A protein has these predicted regions:
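Glycine-centered loop/turn positions within well-structured domains
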Residues: 54, 71, 87
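Short acidic-glycine-tyrosine-enriched beta hairpin
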Residues: 69-84
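Conserved short histidine dyad/triad with adjacent acidic residue
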Residues: 20, 33-51
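Asparagine-centered strand-capping/turn motif at beta-strand->loop junctions
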Residues: 89-92
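A short hydrophobic beta-strand segment most commonly corresponding to one strand
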Residues: 34-36, 56, 80, 94-111
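A short, N-terminal "cap"/entry segment at the start of jelly-roll beta-barrel domains
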Residues: 1-31, 115-124
Length: 124
């Protein structure tokens, strides 16, 4: 069993977002990846991306808008995004949103313009 304590988890700061890697192949999980995503108020993804696996978003605090239709998801809610669905995420409230994300290990991401970006560093 692998325990990942918050202070030891790798953190990736991007404009308007913080990804904190939890479970992944390099952190003891062969089949699944999870990370915590913090979204600053007013943030909106500049472009959509798609993934080759289903992705699950569980909103722990705040609220977000997600997907091609910018569907709202509030604290305590979850969204299951099927593989191949264009994903955009944005803050939907006045405060910071916190989300736990889960997906199969080894997934690959493709940006809206067709650029393949593979697996991001918080999920390896």
């Amino acid at each position: 069993m692998t325990i990942i304590q918050a202070p030891e988890a790798p953190r990736f700061d991007l404009p308007g977002l913080v990804f904190t890697g939890l479970a992944s192949p390099s952190r003891g999980s062969t089949d699944l990846c999870t990370w915590r995503l913090e979204i600053e108020p007013g943030f909106a993804s500049p472009e959509a991306h798609t993934l080759d696996r289903d992705e699950i978003f569980v909103v722990v605090a705040g609220s977000i808008r997600l997907g091609p239709d910018e569907a709202p998801v509030g604290a305590g809610g979850a969204a299951v995004v099927p593989a191949g669905t264009p994903i955009r995420v944005s803050s939907a409230g006045d405060g910071r949103a916190e989300v736990v994300v889960a997906i199969s290990a080894g997934f690959s991401a493709t940006m809206e313009d067709g650029t393949e970006v593979g697996t991001p560093p918080w999920a390896v």
